[in-house]
Amino acid sequence: MPYQLLERDYDALTVGDAEVTRARTITEADVVAFCTLTGDMFALHTDRVAAERSLFRRRIVPGMLVLAYSYGLGVPPGSSTILANYGTDALRFPAPTFIDDTIHLEAAVEEKRERDARGGIVTLRWDVVNQNGTTVCASKLLVLVARSAA
């Protein structure tokens, strides 16, 4: 079954609802494009020799790229229920992501707060997990979600 958590309206979401997305592999081309686009030329992302001398022994993927890909995995492009991204809290990168790692998103509703007649703020546990089951990016995503039209 495809990921549908953020296709639901505010009233249909329940604390504890959880889903896992499809996976995607992060390639060297992804890292090069991201670093070029953003200007993030930090040596651990771009310099193989420097990275081999580092704590990680090889190049790592920029954390912001991992977070950006999590939105691509977890936010449906045609969603009519998401009114706005309200923010991200408690962002952490507890383990490195390496080139050629395959990641997926594990999302769960942790809290709902009524806002107004149009909808409410939903807080989701937003964890990116690699092919080994290791969480590489953990955060709380806050989304303004529409109420049902009925």
Residue ranges of model-derived segments:
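Short beta-strand or tight-loop elements
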Residues: 84, 89, 105
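HotDog/MaoC-like acyl-thioester-processing domains
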Residues: 1-15, 93, 97-102, 106-150
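Hot-dog-fold acyl-thioester-processing enzymes
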Residues: 1-86, 150
